[in-house]
Amino acid sequence: MTRSLGGAELATSIRNDASVAAAALNDLGTRPKLAVVQATDDESTAWYVRSIASAAKRTGILCDIVDLGAAASTEQIRSTLVELGHDPDVHGIILQTPLPDGTDLDALREAINPAKDVDGANPVSLGRLVARLPAFAPATAQAVIALLDHHGISPHARTATVVGRSTVVGSPVAHLLVQRNATVTVCHRHTTDLAAGTRDADILVVAVGIPGLITADHVADGAVVIDVGTTATADGQLLGDVDAAAVDGRAGALTPVPGGVGPVTTALLLNHTVDAAGTQYAQTRSESVLAGFRSSV
């Protein structure tokens, strides 16, 4: 029987910690605030963004949904991100995808203030992650590691395969696993024999957005399988990248979809926002003290 690696309990714990920290900052006169920028008429995306806002409210975090519409240009989105980056009342910024066709996503990610980049999208954040310097990791990638830790699964000295190499999940997950001393293989669309790259892995992370891609043939006996994929169907179901029925009994453990990585990702975004608010509060206080000192001499 395959063990289910649910994320609800961990997500609740993370949100509770964030709520306590948010309340402490509120007592100091700083209310953590998250801004989510979207430019799409995709209803599943709008639902996801609303779920973030709802979770933020329950955690004591303000959340502004900045909806620029599906016709927004790169420059419109970029100027909004820059403005939010300079707004002292905004502590965290998320650029939600998908975006309109033709949008320069790289330019937009570069426009996110790294101090407020709570989803680790800016190249500065990603570079610091690779260099093992303090930075916010992409929340979904961090959620994968957090789930492993929560369920007592150590990547140390184990083999891991990551299917997918996006800058928001696959690549950062691979780096985080290496930092935890796993031996990591990355597979992608140009991998000629996917099963050859996955079937010997102790830990298999799948993040490509192709429902049912991974079957029993891709999974080693007893492997830990982390399914990051979430594809919405026309009737409102969420499907993972792993054929859960096919790997049941073969995989040692599997994250459910929904209810696995997703809730932890949202909780970490809120936790990052509170952390960013605390850092920005401390920096402002330090600057105020320094200004007061300078004016007295």
Curated annotation (Swiss-Prot):
Pathway: One-carbon metabolism; tetrahydrofolate interconversion. GO terms for molecular function: methenyltetrahydrofolate cyclohydrolase activity; methylenetetrahydrofolate dehydrogenase (NADP+) activity. InterPro entries: Aminoacid_DH-like_N_sf, NAD(P)-bd_dom_sf, THF_DH/CycHdrlase, THF_DH/CycHdrlase_cat_dom, THF_DH/CycHdrlase_NAD-bd_dom. Pfam families: THF_DHG_CYH, THF_DHG_CYH_C. Its EC number is 1.5.1.5, 3.5.4.9. Gene3D superfamilies: Leucine Dehydrogenase, chain A, domain 1, NAD(P)-binding Rossmann-like Domain. NADP(+) binds at residues 164-166, 230. SUPFAM superfamilies: Aminoacid dehydrogenase-like, N-terminal domain, NAD(P)-binding Rossmann-fold domains. It comes from the Bacteria. One of its GO terms (biological process) is tetrahydrofolate interconversion. Homodimer. Belongs to the tetrahydrofolate dehydrogenase/cyclohydrolase family. Catalyzes the oxidation of 5,10-methylenetetrahydrofolate to 5,10-methenyltetrahydrofolate and then the hydrolysis of 5,10-methenyltetrahydrofolate to 10-formyltetrahydrofolate. This is Bifunctional protein FolD 1.
